[in-house]
C-alpha cells in the first residue's frame, strides 16, 4: 500500500555551488509548462490512496511566482490525506513572508523545511548562497508563528570551517528551538561548481569530530538522534523520511523524482526539457527478494533503532 508521495520542483533563483540535485534557473513559462506536465503525471499514476505523508521538495518550491504557487497548490489538492497527516513544504528563507506562510497553512501544509545550511556569512561566496544571519533568524521566528513543526537543514565540514564556526551555528539553532534538524557533511559531487573549482572536502578526522560534536550537542539539548543525519524533538521525527528508511512504498512525481512501488524502484528524467515533452521515466528496476531484503537491512541500519525483526519477518517470512 502506498502512503507517501514526494513531489520535485526543480527550480531555483540561484544555484548553490555544492548542489547536485535536479535543478534549473527559474523561468516563468518553463515552470508553467512543468506544472501542466506534473498534473498529467499525477493524474495518470496516482490511484487515490489516502496518504500519510506528502513532501514538496526541490530545487526551491518557495521560489515559484504567486500565480504558479497557487497553481501548484491546486494540483496538490488532488491527493487525499489521512486525518493524522504530515505535509512538508521546502522553503528558502528569503522567500518566507506572511503571505506565503498564510497560503501554505490554509492549504493543509503542516511542516516547513528551511534550507539554512549555515548562519555564517563568511561562507556566502564559496557556497554561492546569500547568507544573512539576522534575516534567517527573523524568518524562522516568523515561521514559528504559523507552524509548530519546522525543520532546519544544517551543513557542516564546509571549506575552511572550524569547530568554533560549527559551534556558533549550533548555538543559534539551540536558541531557535525548532522541532527537527537535518545535518549533512558537505560532499563535493561531480559536475558541481565546487568540483570545477577544485575545492577539496574536509579531512575525515575533522568531519568525524564535527559529526560527534553535533550529535552530543543536539542530544544534550533535547533532540532525539533517530537517524544518522537527523534529530527531532519528541514525536517530531520526519514521518516522510522514515518511509524511505523503512523501505516502504512511495510515489515520486516530477523531474528528478524517484519512487518505489510494488518492488520496483524508478527514477524520472532529470531533464526538465524532456519532462515538459512528456518523457518522464528513464529507469525502472524490479528487485528480487534478496535485493529487497538487502535494501531493507541497509536502510534500516541508518536508523538508530536499527532493524525491526518483527517487521522484517512480517514482510519476508524470515527470522533474523
Identify the meaning behind each predicted range.
Residues 1-9:
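Immediate flanking context of iron-sulfur cluster ligation sites
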Residues 2, 24-44, 52-318:
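C-terminal scaffold of the Radical SAM
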